[in-house]
A protein has these predicted regions:
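Q-loop/switch helix immediately C-terminal to the Walker
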Residues: 89-104
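Helix-to-loop junction immediately C-terminal to a conserved catalytic motif
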Residues: 48
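Conserved ABC ATPase "signature" region
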Residues: 108-127
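Conserved ABC ATPase signature
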Residues: 131-135, 139
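Catalytic Walker B motif of ABC-type/P-loop ATPase nucleotide-binding domains
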Residues: 156-160
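Helix N-cap at the start of a conserved alpha-helix in ABC-type nucleotide-binding domains
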Residues: 167-169
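Conserved ABC transporter NBD signature motif
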Residues: 52-64, 73
Length: 206
């Protein structure tokens, strides 16, 4: 499902990955681990065509990454960055933005599914009526996971999805991701959390 073949990623004169290869089969829940600065986030971005690929090959599903296939690849992927910047005033506006990416409209049925997902992540549906400034970073992370699931993408790429969470909230996220894996999703997540990684089906060590 996801594959890199001898890739190198370089920012200016700094090479963060050199000759790296990996393979993630469909339906795998994989955790990327390694020391700070070793290229974990860059690897996630490489699958989206967002990292400066110096050499090597990246494949997502049936596509080999190129300027011609980036758009098709991104339509298969749900991406949650670690530093989540949402340039909107309200939670509702953020939801509508994500839904537009998937050509979806916010209606009663979408709200019903979204509220179910929020509950699974330990969040109340009244969060949908709040301003973004009123919710914490950890709530934003969980809220965005609930929204991204509406897009029904085959691949989930997550950068430190539990970093800002307490133990209880972290466990909500892990349970939610394991449920997505059972539904056939392929999940690749960066994490420093030993408990999180212990529940994954594969480890990508950098």
């Amino acid at each position: 499902m996801l594959q890199t073949d001898n890739i190198s990623i370089q920012y200016g004169d700094e090479r963060v990955l050199s000759g790296f290869s990996c393979h993630v089969a469909k339906g795998t829940f994989a955790c990327i681990m390694g020391a700070s600065g070793c290229g974990k986030t860059s690897l996630i971005k490489a699958f989206l065509g967002l990292a400066p690929l110096y050499k090597g090959v990246v494949r997502v599903g049936e596509y080999m990454l190129s300027e011609h296939t980036c758009s098709a690849i991104r339509k298969q992927v749900a991406y949650l960055p670690q530093d989540l910047a949402l340039p909107y005033d309200t939670v509702y506006e953020a939801v509508c933005h994500v839904l537009r990416i998937g050509d979806l409209r916010y209606d009663r049925s979408i709200r019903s599914v979204l509220c179910e997902n929020l509950a699974k992540l330990g969040l109340d549906e009244d969060l949908l009526d709040k301003r973004l400034a009123e919710i914490s970073g950890g709530q934003r992370q969980r809220f965005m996971l609930a929204v991204l699931s509406l897009l029904d993408r085959e691949v989930w790429l997550l950068d430190e999805p539990t970093a800002a969470l307490d133990r209880v909230s972290r466990d909500y996220v892990i349970d939610f991701l394991l449920e997505q894996q059972r539904r056939g999703k392929t999940i690749v997540a960066v994490s420093h959390d030993a408990h999180f990684s212990s529940l994954c089906s594969a480890i990508i060590q950098l």
